[in-house]
């Protein structure tokens, strides 16, 4: 049996081919698995469970169909969809996990994260993250009319794209540092949790890294994004493998 991990699909009506690839993945590759874990950024944006979206409806229906076959589905919010709530989770048949979460993966304790908590060199983002994860902020935001939430999301996305563009046009080494995990934070996280494996997404740099932390040899698995293709991590009792899914 196999456990599947995905992240950073960034599903968006503007990219229907990726949504179709994901729906096909759910129909053809997930049934019979031990579990499916979605480690954040399933959607490009999420401003409340009450937002009308035919694409989100189709995704919820497909995920619920998977869950009804007996495959448990878990969702960990990312930086784009941290407002996914209990109403959508019920429709989709998944359980929302806190970030981070430790699971027993075929006998090996494994830390699951979206990954943005490891990017501590991006101090501006970490401040924004702390603000937007505050329950009081979220309650106030979700109480606003839909039009106001849409406007806020558009402004936030424009600011994010402008900052990314500014970083890319500047020092390339600085761009790579700010947009990737901080090695010191990775080491500290391994030591803090006392385990030897982390699985995360967020950085869109799929790879399997071997690092030394706390006097132990540890593994950090980075999931891939779903922009030009799909990406899935398959884990079983014998090991793990990152795979691409062609459009």
UniProtKB/Swiss-Prot annotation:
<comment type="similarity">
    <text>Belongs to the LpxH family.</text>
</comment>
<feature type="binding site">
    <location>
        <position position="122"/>
    </location>
    <ligand>
        <name>substrate</name>
    </ligand>
</feature>
<keyword id="KW-0443">Lipid metabolism</keyword>
<comment type="function">
    <text>Hydrolyzes the pyrophosphate bond of UDP-2,3-diacylglucosamine to yield 2,3-diacylglucosamine 1-phosphate (lipid X) and UMP by catalyzing the attack of water at the alpha-P atom. Involved in the biosynthesis of lipid A, a phosphorylated glycolipid that anchors the lipopolysaccharide to the outer membrane of the cell.</text>
</comment>
<keyword id="KW-0464">Manganese</keyword>
<dbReference type="InterPro" id="IPR029052">
    <property type="entry name" value="Metallo-depent_PP-like"/>
</dbReference>
<keyword id="KW-0378">Hydrolase</keyword>
<feature type="binding site">
    <location>
        <position position="174"/>
    </location>
    <ligand>
        <name>substrate</name>
    </ligand>
</feature>
<feature type="binding site">
    <location>
        <position position="41"/>
    </location>
    <ligand>
        <name>Mn(2+) 1</name>
    </ligand>
</feature>
<feature type="binding site">
    <location>
        <position position="79"/>
    </location>
    <ligand>
        <name>Mn(2+) 2</name>
    </ligand>
</feature>
<dbReference type="GO" id="GO:0019897">
    <property type="term" value="C:extrinsic component of plasma membrane"/>
</dbReference>
<dbReference type="GO" id="GO:0008758">
    <property type="term" value="F:UDP-2,3-diacylglucosamine hydrolase activity"/>
</dbReference>
<dbReference type="GO" id="GO:0030145">
    <property type="term" value="F:manganese ion binding"/>
</dbReference>
<dbReference type="GO" id="GO:0005737">
    <property type="term" value="C:cytoplasm"/>
</dbReference>
<keyword id="KW-0444">Lipid biosynthesis</keyword>
<keyword id="KW-0997">Cell inner membrane</keyword>
<feature type="binding site">
    <location>
        <position position="8"/>
    </location>
    <ligand>
        <name>Mn(2+) 1</name>
    </ligand>
</feature>
<feature type="binding site">
    <location>
        <position position="202"/>
    </location>
    <ligand>
        <name>substrate</name>
    </ligand>
</feature>
<dbReference type="InterPro" id="IPR004843">
    <property type="entry name" value="Calcineurin-like_PHP_ApaH"/>
</dbReference>
<dbReference type="InterPro" id="IPR043461">
    <property type="entry name" value="LpxH-like"/>
</dbReference>
<feature type="binding site">
    <location>
        <position position="10"/>
    </location>
    <ligand>
        <name>Mn(2+) 1</name>
    </ligand>
</feature>
<feature type="binding site">
    <location>
        <position position="204"/>
    </location>
    <ligand>
        <name>Mn(2+) 1</name>
    </ligand>
</feature>
<feature type="binding site">
    <location>
        <position position="202"/>
    </location>
    <ligand>
        <name>Mn(2+) 2</name>
    </ligand>
</feature>
<feature type="binding site">
    <location>
        <position position="171"/>
    </location>
    <ligand>
        <name>substrate</name>
    </ligand>
</feature>
<keyword id="KW-0472">Membrane</keyword>
<dbReference type="GO" id="GO:0009245">
    <property type="term" value="P:lipid A biosynthetic process"/>
</dbReference>
<feature type="binding site">
    <location>
        <position position="114"/>
    </location>
    <ligand>
        <name>Mn(2+) 2</name>
    </ligand>
</feature>
<feature type="binding site">
    <location>
        <position position="41"/>
    </location>
    <ligand>
        <name>Mn(2+) 2</name>
    </ligand>
</feature>
<keyword id="KW-1003">Cell membrane</keyword>
<feature type="binding site">
    <location>
        <position position="160"/>
    </location>
    <ligand>
        <name>substrate</name>
    </ligand>
</feature>
<keyword id="KW-0479">Metal-binding</keyword>
<keyword id="KW-0441">Lipid A biosynthesis</keyword>
<dbReference type="Pfam" id="PF00149">
    <property type="entry name" value="Metallophos"/>
</dbReference>
<protein>
    <recommendedName>
        <fullName>UDP-2,3-diacylglucosamine hydrolase</fullName>
        <ecNumber>3.6.1.54</ecNumber>
    </recommendedName>
</protein>
<dbReference type="InterPro" id="IPR010138">
    <property type="entry name" value="UDP-diacylglucosamine_Hdrlase"/>
</dbReference>
<comment type="pathway">
    <text>Glycolipid biosynthesis; lipid IV(A) biosynthesis; lipid IV(A) from (3R)-3-hydroxytetradecanoyl-[acyl-carrier-protein] and UDP-N-acetyl-alpha-D-glucosamine: step 4/6.</text>
</comment>
<feature type="binding site">
    <location>
        <begin position="79"/>
        <end position="80"/>
    </location>
    <ligand>
        <name>substrate</name>
    </ligand>
</feature>
